[in-house]
């Protein structure tokens, strides 16, 4: 009897280990679909989900996801719709991670959003970044270019922020670049107002929550006389009335520098020897589930009219033989690799060097 019990325990352990490996390959721990939620919250949501979907492992997995990310669904029809999207996202994660690519996907809070919803709430409309057609970055001594760079180690990169349900990525790329430049120049941290750019920079071919470009934002700040601090002009994530106040300015821009369209050698020179650079690229569906590794794709475009998301290049390096850009995103610190991702370098991947610029601060 004791011998049989040991065999059963070993078998159970093997099953558990297999489940854990499968969960790891999907980027989503489903070994116990309801384990990490509170009893009260789990019970309430489980009842809602079971009523709409039936008592299945997948339904409980979905309930756990919803509780973890604070989801609220209006009725049974919405539960069913979100569950269907979630299931498609889970399959995308698993199938991608089985391909042996240099990056991995994982389930995150975007897993129950359709691609159309995600585009509308997180990405901007394509912009014709004509400023980079003829760049004005002066190449610095290539002999001084470090093999790897991470400006976070220099203490000038500000914390990751979250743009919320507003296509204002361009404002966060802009403030991230300015915050780094200001701290580099003064030794002092600063948090700058994205909302001022959303509300006030429309005359410079920017469109608030519908998109814009850092190069155009730098021009606005230069001629406006400055950008207010975050404290004085806090973020709301919706288009509003401009209420910029000169007395609350946190930084002024003397000029901006543009990287020649597609010139990754210029971009590397700037990131390695100057400071973090605002960049933009084309987000395609799978990218929103990025978890770790060096992202690469054969399906994204590289032209100015392809790019739809602005971010901040804060370094570069090599991982498992693949050169990469280290990039700060604006989807919160719980997204990706603590709010960051790596993008393959050397192919102008997804247009990463197509619309790149950085400011010179006063």
UniProtKB/Swiss-Prot annotation:
Q: What is its EC number?
A: 3.4.22.-
Per its record, what triggers expression of this gene product? By gibberellic acid (GA).
| Active site residues according to the UniProt entry | 169, 309, 329
List the GO biological process terms. Answer: immune response; positive regulation of apoptotic signaling pathway; proteolysis involved in protein catabolic process
Q: Which residues form the propeptide?
A: 25-144
Where does the secretion signal sit in this chain?
1-24
Give expression by tissue: Expressed only in seeds.
**What are the protein's GO molecular function terms?**
cysteine-type endopeptidase activity
Using the chain's own numbering, where are the disulfide bonds? 166-209, 200-242, 300-350
Entry-linked Pfam families: Inhibitor_I29 (PF08246), Peptidase_C1 (PF00112)
Report the sequence similarity comment from the record.
Belongs to the peptidase C1 family.
PANTHER family the record matches: CYSTEINE PROTEASE FAMILY C1-RELATED (PTHR12411)
Q: What is this protein called?
A: Oryzain gamma chain
């Amino acid at each position: 009897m004791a011998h049989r019990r040991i065999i059963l325990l070993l078998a159970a352990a093997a099953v558990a280990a297999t489940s854990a490996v499968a969960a790891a390959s999907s980027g989503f721990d489903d070994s116990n679909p309801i384990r990490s939620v509170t009893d009260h919250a789990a019970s309430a949501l489980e009842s809602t989900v079971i009523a709409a979907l039936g008592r299945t492992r997948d339904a409980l997995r979905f309930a756990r996801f919803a509780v973890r990310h604070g989801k609220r669904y209006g009725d049974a029809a919405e539960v069913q719709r979100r569950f269907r999207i979630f299931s498609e996202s889970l399959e995308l994660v698993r199938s991608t991670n089985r391909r042996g690519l240099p990056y991995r996907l994982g389930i995150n809070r975007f897993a129950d959003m359709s691609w159309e919803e995600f585009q509308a709430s997180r990405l901007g409309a394509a912009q014709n970044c004509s400023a980079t057609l003829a760049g004005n970055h002066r190449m610095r001594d290539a002999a001084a270019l470090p093999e790897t760079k991470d400006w976070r180690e220099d203490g000038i990169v500000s914390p990751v922020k979250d743009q919320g349900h507003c296509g204002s990525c361009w404002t966060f790329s802009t403030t991230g670049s300015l915050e780094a430049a200001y701290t580099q120049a003064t030794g002092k941290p600063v948090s700058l107002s994205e909302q001022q750019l959303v509300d006030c920079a429309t005359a410079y071919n920017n469109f608030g929550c519908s998109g814009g470009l850092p190069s155009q934002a730098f021009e606005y700040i230069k001629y406006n006389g400055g950008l207010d601090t975050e404290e004085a002009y806090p973020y709301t994530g919706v288009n509003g009335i401009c209420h910029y106040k000169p007395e609350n300015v946190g930084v002024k821009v003397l000029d901006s520098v543009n990287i020649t369209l597609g010139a990754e050698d210029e971009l590397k020179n700037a990131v390695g020897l100057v400071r973090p650079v605002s960049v933009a690229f084309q987000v395609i569906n799978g990218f929103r589930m990025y978890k770790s590794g060096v992202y690469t794709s054969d399906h994204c475009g590289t032209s100015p009219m392809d790019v739809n998301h602005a971010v901040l290049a804060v370094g570069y390096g090599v991982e498992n033989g693949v050169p990469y850009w280290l990039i700060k995103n604006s989807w919160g610190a719980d997204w990706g690799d603590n709010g960051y991702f790596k993008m393959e370098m050397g192919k102008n991947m997804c247009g990463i060097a197509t619309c790149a610029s950085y400011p010179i601060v006063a």
